[in-house]
């Protein structure tokens, strides 16, 4: 796990201390965390056979859980246990997905509780579709990223107020601003402080 800074920009009002597990170089490339794409289960078949990657959903979920257990244990030592874990919602309204397509959120919730964090994975719920940004060509099924999109398309819990929050996403890409906007939304909702963690960081 490595530390970096998400810098303030036109979307985010302050720098945010952040962490990531490994580089994300592209599906099928050497040493890439391909399990992140498999966990999304976009095809709904519980298996991925694409760009030389052949993996079942269950195997991908186990890989993800192992990484989260390792890294969040370290973050508990760095940030303390008095932290609430929140997760970036998927791009479409949550009720548009099958349970098997929401495994990232489920695993983050499981690991958070196992390590003694407050489970806030239900504190940000997408209710309006936005564009799918992880695909090579964005799926035009909703609004593209813009300042304030999180508050416009999600319900944010009142429980955010006053909390120290670690926001988790699967992949961080600097130019997209989805994570920056969500961090700002948490601050606007009264979070005491915010940190960020991603499994993969796009290079």
Predicted regions located by residue number:
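Active-site-facing substrate-recognition patch
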Residues: 1-84, 91-98, 125-161, 200-202
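A short coil-to-beta-strand element that immediately follows conserved catalytic motifs
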Residues: 84-85, 115-125
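Short hydrophobic segments within beta-strands
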Residues: 86-88, 168, 197
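Charged helix-capping and loop-helix junction motifs
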Residues: 100-106
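Residues at the starts of beta-strands that form the adenosine-phosphate
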Residues: 120, 164, 192-195
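Accessory, usually C-terminal, subdomains that scaffold auxiliary metal cofactors
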Residues: 151-152, 172, 177-179, 197-203
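Long C-terminal interaction/binding lobes of large macromolecular proteins
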Residues: 159-167, 171-172, 180-188
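A short, conserved beta-to-alpha structural element at the edge of catalytic cores
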Residues: 183-203
